[in-house]
Amino acid sequence: MPANYQSVPQDDPSVPNLAQAPPAYSEYNESATENPAVDQFKNTTPVAECAKSIRMAFLRKVYAILTAQLFVTSLFGGIFYLHPAFSFWVQMHPWFLILNFFISLVVLFGLIMKPYSYPRNYIFLFLFTALEGLTLGTAITFFSARIILEAVFITLGVFVALTAFTFQSKWDFSRLGGFLYVSLWSLILTPLIFFFVPSTPFIDMAFAGFGTLVFCGYILFDTYNILHRYSPEEFIMSSLMLYLDFINLFIRILQILGMLQNNDNN
């Protein structure tokens, strides 16, 4: 004999009403639609496809960090230039530059591994910038103050012009990647040849000029990528890439101006 089933009173608050329709999806997703900027920061949407407010906030952050990096580098450069004893000690102890190079690689590796880990990403970025400032501060002591200032202003002008051109251009500069990659390795490996084959002033000038063109290309390439390939969360790595482009371009322009000055003196 089947059991007698008794219907549950619908007004009993202790029993859920399973027949009731579930709430609309928008009720669960309400918090996500209240602030669309939050969703865009959580996914991998490229900066160029984000809302204008997010794009502008990202660019302000990137170039503010870049400005701070250049300030720290200039500070170290000024200390070394105004106090030659520091640079003289480094020149007399080349092991320091070698150690500085390997520490820079370790710090850079840590930054690449933890680009979103606050505050470690800022600490790694500051340490890397300081170490680069030590190396650059030693290098610029071989040049006159006039040449250094000329190189700074030329580099700044070229950097701003190329950045502005990339922002308004419709060209896809990511296509330069293959050429720039091969060119960069050429810049790294070619000096090894000079250990066996003596260089000439013409070769040195051509090599510095080629390096200038390569890092001008990298400014176009990296500026395009931070807009079209990077998400708004990747501001630390964006600043780092632009910083390395600026410093490497400055070094090549400084070399060219120094060689031109030597030719005039001769």
Swiss-Prot record:
CC terms in the record's Gene Ontology section: endoplasmic reticulum membrane; fungal-type vacuole membrane; Golgi membrane; membrane; mitochondrial membrane
Signal peptide residues on this chain, from the entry's feature table: none
InterPro entries: Bax_inhibitor_1-related
Any GO BP: endoplasmic reticulum unfolded protein response
Any one Pfam family match given in the protein's UniProt record, by short name: Bax1-I
Keyword set, alphabetical order: Apoptosis, Endoplasmic reticulum, Golgi apparatus, Membrane, Mitochondrion, Transmembrane, Transmembrane helix, Vacuole
Coiled coil: none
Name listed for the protein in its UniProt record: Bax inhibitor 1
GO molecular function: calcium channel activity
Function: Links the unfolded protein response and programmed cell death and mediates mitochondrial-dependent apoptosis. Induces cell death and disruption of the mitochondrial transmembrane potential.
Disordered as annotated region, ranges: 1-22
Regions crossing the membrane: 70-90, 92-112, 123-143, 147-167, 177-197, 201-221, 240-260
Subcellular location: Endoplasmic reticulum membrane; Mitochondrion membrane; Golgi apparatus membrane; Vacuole membrane
Gene from which the chain derives: bxi1
Membrane topology: Multi-pass membrane protein
Superkingdom, natural source: Eukaryota
Protein family (similarity comment): Belongs to the BI1 family. LFG subfamily.
Main localization of the protein described in the UniProt heading: endoplasmic reticulum
Organism: Schizosaccharomyces pombe (strain 972 / ATCC 24843) (Fission yeast)
